[in-house]
Design a protein with these regions (language model features):
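Residue-level marker of beta-strand positions
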Residues: 6, 64-66, 124
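Catalytic metal- and UDP-sugar-binding loop of GT-A-like glycosyltransferases, i.e.
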Residues: 9-10, 69
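Short, glycine/charged-rich "phosphate-handling" switch motifs in NTP-dependent
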Residues: 6, 18-19, 27
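Short, conserved beta-turn/loop elements at beta-strand boundaries and strand-helix junctions
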Residues: 90-97, 139
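ATPase nucleotide-binding modules
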Residues: 22, 26-88, 101-119, 142-148
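A short, surface-exposed alpha-helical micro-motif characterized by mixed small hydrophobic
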Residues: 1-2
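Generic C-terminus detector
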Residues: 119-148
């Protein structure tokens, strides 16, 4: 993202989106662009694999579609209302940690934590989704609502 002022994202020879790296990161036009830009890539899960409370937050145009959240918009919480998940992988990267988790419904979620994490594979955790940072996609993968 730091190599250019403007980026063209192509898929099968067709232009998907043109814009600054941050425009593509913050306002992708579809799920393909959303997952193409950023490392680790955006978490995208079918709404059907997420708890009812998350499904209820989706705009009507995203029903049956998917939710996208960047790893920095997912947090591990002690709140009982958090989404249950199990740690499947921990990547200690020095100044930050990537925690890969799976919900009982089957959604795979990556959490970017700014500090070192003390989690281990198999640990039960609770996840908090910052839905103010949500990207909603329809059943065709088109963006129906991006972060404000």
């Amino acid at each position: 993202m730091t190599l250019a002022d403007r980026v063209v994202v192509l898929r099968d020879g067709l232009i998907e989106q043109v814009g600054s790296p941050l425009d593509l990161y913050d306002r992708p036009v579809n799920q393909f662009v959303a997952q193409f830009i950023g490392t680790p890539q955006m978490n995208v899960a079918l709404l059907s694999t997420l708890p009812a409370v998350v499904q209820a937050a989706a705009p009507a145009s995203a029903k049956g579609g998917s939710l996208g959240l960047r790893p920095e918009s997912v947090h591990i919480t002690t709140d009982a209302d958090g989404i249950a998940a199990k740690v499947v992988l921990v990547e200690a990267l020095g100044a930050e940690t990537l925690i890969y988790a799976q919900t009982p419904e089957g959604a795979q979620v990556v959490v970017r934590q700014a500090q070192r994490a003390l989690f281990r594979v198999g640990d039960a955790v609770r996840l908090q989704f910052d839905l103010s940072q949500a990207h909603w996609f329809d059943t065709e993968g088109r963006t129906v609502q991006n972060v404000a």
